[in-house]
Amino acid sequence: MPVSSDCQILKEDNVTHSFCGLACVGWLYQKIKDSFFLILGTHTCAHFLQNALGMMIFAKPRFGVALIEEADLSRAEPQLEAVIEEIKRDHNPSVIFLLSSCTPEVMKVDFKGLAHHLSTDKTPVLFVPASGLVFNFTQAEDSVLQALVPFCPEAPAGEKKVVFVGSVNDITADDLRTEAEQLGIPVGGFLPESRFDKLPAIGPDTVLAPIQPYLSRVCSRLNRERGSQVLTSLFPFGPDGTKTFWEDLAAMFGIKVDLSDRAEAAWEKIKPQTDLLKGKKIFLTADTMMELPLARFLKNAGAEVVECSSAYINKKFHARELEALEGVKVVEQPNFHRQLEEIRATRPDMIVTSLMTANPFVGNGFIVKWSMEFTLMSIHSWSGVFTLANLFVSPLLRRESLPEFDESVWLEGVMPSAQ
């Protein structure tokens, strides 16, 4: 479906203020319960994962870092055989994902050859490009799913089922499956599934329903290699997106449904939240690649979206979201310094931004929402509507409950020079 000519995308050239791709381990190791994620990286990678994911070593999580030391610089390839054997003894995984990071990529480590060398028939080792030089933290999920594609069975022609593409927790997955079955849509499974040996069969008559907005590459690959159809719709966030998503998906199976009443009831359920959002100026900086559907929900909830920026926009994959953002300033790969000037000039009521930039904004008196929270919470479909709305209004309510900022009180005894 062509993008509306009214939706203008401004392309800039700045770096992404985001976590690197290794952060995807945080939710994927919990989703794929018989997996292990091994990162070949430095002490920086190890500190990042332990602190960002809040895991202690004695908890024996199903991820780890094989540290590159100075001695490794003189070797042709890192020696990981002993590490792999230890992982197998301690965790007995069905699959091991070998993730790249910045330093070994600069060293030109042959990850594909290394993964092939370490693989066995019983426990394949799959290379996942996840370096922060190329990917932000949500895009690396796309890399993990692409690594799984060769292990998805071939579905025969004529077997028309939907496969939901994107990692969600088991409760959300059950909700999506139940909703589809109630609408008469046959479900083939999820990519990824909770176990490596339960990957869905995908073939020429499979309908791929992406439920995360950062998975364009794996959907394109399955369309190209398996001939699968890819649903082009809004993503199932908010009453508006959920209604359109299910109606469009049903239509691909020849089922006509009208979910207007259900969407209206969902809007009514979150009326206290949307009343608070109406008229509020909200600015979304680039971070998670979820910005387009989040901005669309805010717009339909009555907020004024000052700017919606994202690290990467695929005009085909995001076509429906872009059409729904008619009249909104949409920026790809935004220049953060330019954004700072616009934020100072427009003084938005709330900024949805990364953890890196959140505290400086707060220090300058702005209300901030961490964009990363939207990747970790259950905000999909009808069951996620209330959670999604609450995520946006919680910082507004928190600011209302706080006393007025009194600089002298905050600085008393801390900065004598300021007295």
From Swiss-Prot:
The protein's name in its UniProt record: Light-independent protochlorophyllide reductase subunit N
Domain of life: Bacteria
EC number annotated for this UniProt entry: 1.3.7.7
Function summary: Component of the dark-operative protochlorophyllide reductase (DPOR) that uses Mg-ATP and reduced ferredoxin to reduce ring D of protochlorophyllide (Pchlide) to form chlorophyllide a (Chlide). This reaction is light-independent. The NB-protein (BchN-BchB) is the catalytic component of the complex.
GO BP terms in the entry: light-independent bacteriochlorophyll biosynthetic process; photosynthesis, dark reaction
Quaternary structure, from the entry: Protochlorophyllide reductase is composed of three subunits; BchL, BchN and BchB. Forms a heterotetramer of two BchB and two BchN subunits.
Family: Belongs to the BchN/ChlN family.
UniProt GO molecular function: 4 iron, 4 sulfur cluster binding; ATP binding; metal ion binding; oxidoreductase activity, acting on iron-sulfur proteins as donors; oxidoreductase activity, acting on the CH-CH group of donors, iron-sulfur protein as acceptor
Organism placement in taxonomy: Bacteria, Pseudomonadati, Chlorobiota, Chlorobiia, Chlorobiales
Pfam families reported in the protein's UniProt record: Oxidored_nitro (PF00148)
Matching InterPro entries: LIPOR_BchN/ChlN, Nase/OxRdtase_comp1, Protochl_reductN
Annotated catalysed reactions: chlorophyllide a + oxidized 2[4Fe-4S]-[ferredoxin] + 2 ADP + 2 phosphate = protochlorophyllide a + reduced 2[4Fe-4S]-[ferredoxin] + 2 ATP + 2 H2O
Binding site for [4Fe-4S] cluster: C20, C45, C102
Pathway: Porphyrin-containing compound metabolism; bacteriochlorophyll biosynthesis (light-independent)
Cofactors that this protein relies on: [4Fe-4S] cluster
SUPFAM superfamilies named among the record's database cross-references: Helical backbone' metal receptor
Free-text remark on how the cofactor is bound: Binds 1 [4Fe-4S] cluster per heterodimer. The cluster is bound at the heterodimer interface by residues from both subunits.
Keywords: 4Fe-4S, ATP-binding, Bacteriochlorophyll biosynthesis, Chlorophyll biosynthesis, Iron, Iron-sulfur, Metal-binding, Nucleotide-binding, Oxidoreductase, Photosynthesis
Gene3D superfamilies on file: Nitrogenase molybdenum iron protein domain
EC class of the enzyme, as a word: oxidoreductase
